């Protein structure tokens, strides 16, 4: 079983909707399917790459799926463990969303977001949410790479990483669960939080951690009402 490959990109290929690269490793060329967004990233800069690999073995041969990050490969494996979700659908989900965004969508049951991926219907989206919600909620709590800033849930210009960590610690100390905290911060960052005057709040400034805390607490109290 191949775990990862390091080599030079010889060429890009496309067969219908499937895209990938031929990676030359120690004199052997491996044909690896990757998400289109990663293919465009590989068009620029260095020519040597490391891809984490998932290998699918069939009677008529094997297929390799490559990912620049291990956690994305692991997410792919989690997705294909769900009944009715094959490698192509899993890749489509990871093309539509970055890993952290996909975790958020599944945990929150955001069926509309999941259905934006090619080939994903409402029933499949519901199955993903039901079967993976608890598992991925635990995964997001454990994985230090699942930062709200790193996965694009909030912008680094909205809140410094150190301030974000302080905010999460403070809310956790008040008894809120990690998932509740992440949803609250996301709501405040997107401008979806409602202020005391029943009007949408403006996003607090990057340096005003207290304002972020107040807005998050208001959102959490409204959700609990």
Swiss-Prot record:
Domain notes: Has three domains with a flexible linker between the domains II and III and assumes an 'L' shape. Domain III is highly mobile and contacts RuvB.
Chain positions covered by the region annotation Domain II: 69-147
Recorded family membership: Belongs to the RuvA family.
Keywords for this protein: Cytoplasm, DNA damage, DNA recombination, DNA repair, DNA-binding
GO molecular function (one): four-way junction helicase activity
This protein's record includes keyword Disulfide bond: no
Subcellular location, record wording: Cytoplasm
Domain III, as annotated region: 159-225
Biological function: The RuvA-RuvB-RuvC complex processes Holliday junction (HJ) DNA during genetic recombination and DNA repair, while the RuvA-RuvB complex plays an important role in the rescue of blocked DNA replication forks via replication fork reversal (RFR). RuvA specifically binds to HJ cruciform DNA, conferring on it an open structure. The RuvB hexamer acts as an ATP-dependent pump, pulling dsDNA into and through the RuvAB complex. HJ branch migration allows RuvC to scan DNA until it finds its consensus sequence, where it cleaves and resolves the cruciform DNA.
Gene transcribed to yield this protein: ruvA
GO CC terms: cytoplasm; Holliday junction helicase complex; Holliday junction resolvase complex
Region described as Domain I: 1-68
Assembly with partners or alone: Homotetramer. Forms an RuvA(8)-RuvB(12)-Holliday junction (HJ) complex. HJ DNA is sandwiched between 2 RuvA tetramers; dsDNA enters through RuvA and exits via RuvB. An RuvB hexamer assembles on each DNA strand where it exits the tetramer. Each RuvB hexamer is contacted by two RuvA subunits (via domain III) on 2 adjacent RuvB subunits; this complex drives branch migration. In the full resolvosome a probable DNA-RuvA(4)-RuvB(12)-RuvC(2) complex forms which resolves the HJ.
Source organism per UniProt: Prochlorococcus marinus (strain MIT 9313)
HAMAP family referenced in this protein's UniProt entry, alphabetically: DNA_HJ_migration_RuvA (MF_00031)
GO biological process: DNA recombination; DNA repair
Residue span of region Flexible linker: 148-158
Protein name, UniProt field: Holliday junction branch migration complex subunit RuvA
């Amino acid at each position: 079983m191949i775990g990862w490959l390091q080599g030079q990109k010889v060429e890009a290929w496309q067969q219908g909707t499937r895209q990938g690269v031929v990676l030359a490793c120690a004199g052997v060329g491996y044909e690896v399917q990757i998400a289109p967004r990663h293919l465009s990233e590989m068009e620029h800069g260095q020519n040597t790459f490391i891809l984490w690999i998932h290998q699918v073995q069939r009677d008529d041969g094997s297929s390799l799926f490559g990912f620049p990050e291990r956690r994305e490969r692991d997410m792919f494996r989690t997705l294909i463990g769900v009944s009715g979700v094959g490698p192509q659908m899993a890749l489509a989900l990871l093309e539509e969303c970055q890993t952290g965004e996909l975790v958020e969508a599944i945990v929150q049951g955001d069926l509309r977001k999941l259905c934006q991926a090619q080939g994903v219907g409402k029933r499949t989206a519901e199955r993903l949410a039901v079967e993976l919600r608890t598992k991925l909620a635990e995964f997001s709590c454990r994985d230090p790479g699942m930062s709200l800033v790193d996965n694009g849930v909030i912008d680094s210009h909205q809140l410094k990483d150190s301030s974000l960590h302080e905010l999460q610690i403070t809310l956790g100390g008040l008894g809120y669960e990690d998932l509740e905290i992440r949803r609250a911060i996301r709501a405040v960052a997107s401008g979806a939080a409602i202020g005391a005057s029943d009007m949408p709040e403006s996003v607090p400034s990057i340096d005003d951690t207290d304002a972020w805390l107040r807005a998050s607490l208001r959102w959490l109290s409204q959700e609990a009402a």
